[in-house]
Structures are given as structure tokens and as C-alpha cells.
Amino acid sequence: MVSISLKNKTILITGSAGFIGSSLVLAVLRTVSPVTVIGIDSMNDYYDVSIKEWRLKEIEKEAGKHPEAVYRFIRGNIADRETVQVVFSEYAPDIVVNLAAQAGVRYSITNP
């Protein structure tokens, strides 16, 4: 088993407003200090956006409990090259966890 320290790292988590992504953001904020977590999500409407907004509010509340943790959210699509370049240029993440997905089955049928 490989052990990697996340302390003092900048972690980019894509799909951070989704179920798995938001759970990972919360877990990192609760267990690693100091740390910087950059979340990015397109906030698409493949399912109810209010659920994603609620998750982001929960993350903000949790981040507020950890003064040595930095959390930033970016509304953006990782399919957009310029967005990704800006994120990497501005935050220079040490670790990237790609949990972004196109969750909408109907959309994927009409736009394969």
C-alpha cells in the first residue's frame, strides 16, 4: 500500500458538487490540515441543480470549521481547455482527482 501525505498540498477535485465529489471534498476538509482544496463543477442540469447547490453550502460550512484549510469553488467545465489552463495556472494543484461525469442518461443518448 502506498501512503501519500496530503498535508500542505493543493488538491483539485473535479465534479465536486456531485455526490462522490462533494463527499471527498468534505472528507479531505475534515481529515487533512493544512490543505487547499479546489473544487470544480459545471453545475449542469442533468439532475436537480438545487441538490448540487445544497452540497456546496454544506462544503462551505465545513470549510469554515477548519481555519487551516482553504476551499475554493470554480463553476466551470473541464471539457473547456481554457478553463483548465486557468485553473492550473492559478492554483498549480499537486494532486488531481477527476470525478467529473456526464450523469444525464437522456443527454448522453441525444448527444453521444
Language-model region placement:
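N-terminal Rossmann-like NAD(P)+-binding domain of SDR-like oxidoreductases, especially those catalyzing
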Residues: 1-112
